[in-house]
Amino acid sequence: MRSFHRRRNCLTFALLLTSASAWSSFFALGKVSAESHPLAKSESSLNELSKVQEEFGVKPTDAKHDSVWHNVPGLSGWMLNVPATEAATRQARDQKLHLVWNSALPKVSLKMLPADSIYRGSPGEKSVTLMINVSWGEEYLPKMLETLHKENVRATFFLDGAWVKSHLQMARHIVEEGQDVGSHGTGHPDFKTLTEDRLARQLDVTNTILNTRLGIQCSLIAPPSGSYDGRLVRLATDRHMHVILWTADTIDWKKPQPDVILARVRNHLTPGALILMHPTRSTAEALPQLIRMVRDKGYTLKTVSDVVEEKPSVKPPETLALHPGGLK
């Protein structure tokens, strides 16, 4: 996805210079009545707005099934609402172009695909997701939450039901911090070894704990150790849940040095990557630098819920300042 903030700061929009007469009235919005404003009838102005769509708009990306990554969610795009943009600009009278964007849904969405697990998000934008599986302890969670808060990042915490009951205050703190929450089962069993009845109970019991203790209506399940089979997909689908795996494993459970975690993430940094981590000392120490590294490479961060709901992580600019030299 384009970096909208960068373009807002440096784009001169040479296209406007080729039709200065069509835009000259924008430079004196306060002197022109709404009724006589050329936006209401200027074909040239409409052509220029179409160029704004070309520059800042985003086409949706369809969901698809992949032989390696299983179900890959789609991604909604952004379409400029020209009539609403005209109306908002006329009303504002502040020498700014007020852009109104509509969500453009993919033709093929995730819900249209046959049920399957998800290992990555859409490749349609440069975004990645931090997913943190929590089944034991809370020693390193405060530092991780502090980093996420400071960096204004929302991750997805997959919480074990037994852990929630024994660390309720910390679990509630995660929710209060605005973090995304999913299910990690209860007791960290191997889902593939469970009978179907016990597997169904894993989903239901954990969902009940998350709902009654944290107020979470859970739609995500990350199987412990990534062990699952088709029964989990079917049972989760029956409960309107998505089975979530990962693209990149930090192997932080092996307690590596922070630079090892950073190297593994760097080597797997691709659009839509789901990055698996746990609340360990290594992760807590690596997290600030990891977030900076991801952003320095032009990526944004989003939650797993955003991924399965096919929400883009960045919206095009809502205003563009109008100056004789072009748009800023």
What are these regions, as identified by a protein language model?
Residues 6, 131, 158-159, 274-277:
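Conserved short hydrophobic patches within well-ordered secondary structure
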Residues 5, 37, 65, 70, ...:
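Histidine (H) residue identity feature
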Residues 30, 57, 74-77, 121-124, ...:
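Residue-identity detector for glycine
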Residues 92-190, 209, 216:
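Active-site beta->alpha N-cap acidic-glycine motif
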Residues 189-327:
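Catalytic domains of cell-wall/extracellular-matrix polysaccharide-remodeling enzymes
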Residues 2-130, 139, 301-328:
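N-terminal pre-catalytic segment of deacetylase/amide-hydrolase enzymes
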Residues 80-83, 105-112, 132-138, 174, ...:
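Short acidic/polar alpha-helix capping motifs at helix-coil junctions
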